[in-house]
UniProtKB/Swiss-Prot annotation:
Chain ranges for the short sequence motif NPA 1 as given in the UniProt record: 69-71
Compartments where located: Apical cell membrane; Cell membrane; Cytoplasmic vesicle membrane
Tissue occurrence: Salivary glands, lacrimal glands, corneal epithelium in eye, trachea and lung.
Protein name listed in UniProt: Aquaporin-5
Chief localization: membrane
Record: glycosylation sites: N124
Function: Aquaporins form homotetrameric transmembrane channels, with each monomer independently mediating water transport across the plasma membrane along its osmotic gradient. Plays an important role in fluid secretion in salivary glands. Required for TRPV4 activation by hypotonicity. Together with TRPV4, controls regulatory volume decrease in salivary epithelial cells. Seems to play a redundant role in water transport in the eye, lung and in sweat glands.
Molecular function as annotated in GO: identical protein binding; water channel activity
Family: Belongs to the MIP/aquaporin (TC 1.A.8) family.
GO biological process: camera-type eye morphogenesis; carbon dioxide transport; cellular hypotonic response; odontogenesis; pancreatic juice secretion; protein homotetramerization; saliva secretion; water transport
Gene: Aqp5
Amino acid sequence: MKKEVCSLAFFKAVFAEFLATLIFVFFGLGSALKWPSALPTILQISIAFGLAIGTLAQALGPVSGGHINPAITLALLIGNQISLLRAVFYVAAQLVGAIAGAGILYWLAPLNARGNLAVNALNNNTTPGKAMVVELILTFQLALCIFSSTDSRRTSPVGSPALSIGLSVTLGHLVGIYFTGCSMNPARSFGPAVVMNRFSPSHWVFWVGPIVGAMLAAILYFYLLFPSSLSLHDRVAVVKGTYEPEEDWEDHREERKKTIELTAH
């Protein structure tokens, strides 16, 4: 675990999550600003959120994995794909990034267009319980799409993961906006709520729904549909951040072998 945290790659990944979430929240919320000359449409907002996540997954995914969402990060932890410490750092970076993105937009947007900064709320007489189920379903399909399209074990063509993920986010918004404004991402809900200081009694919906939905998708995908072949010892090592794949051990062995040969000469 100490080795993982002390690496430059780790801190690059954490910063990438901060930056990606900042940009995602800025563009996503920005598409929902209520300009007097042209109010936003459901389609406009849905496409903007999808384009934002797809662009960022393509640009910064290779650095951090492109989670950009605490629900996805926690689901990958449950799915034994990342370490506990990485999950903690990622979630913290995502939440701070979301606040920063919402704060920048608040500062830039004129008062007559700012509105409530697209703070998530229950719409059309949706009860908190139903809203939670809606968020669960929306995030479940998003998480399944992410896990499947980025699974390195797949041998069949998967196309562009960034495009698939972007379309999944767009799909969720096309349905979810009518119920909850569509969160699917606790950071997306948390950022503007902090900046606007508008935490409704139903704010928990935008944490519980997405997190439970993503975790259920992780259990289904990583333990039932496509279970890992790792031993219990290796699974524990993944959570602790000390796991090294066999190919890494082979690389290390070759490097040591070359070093010994050079020293011998």
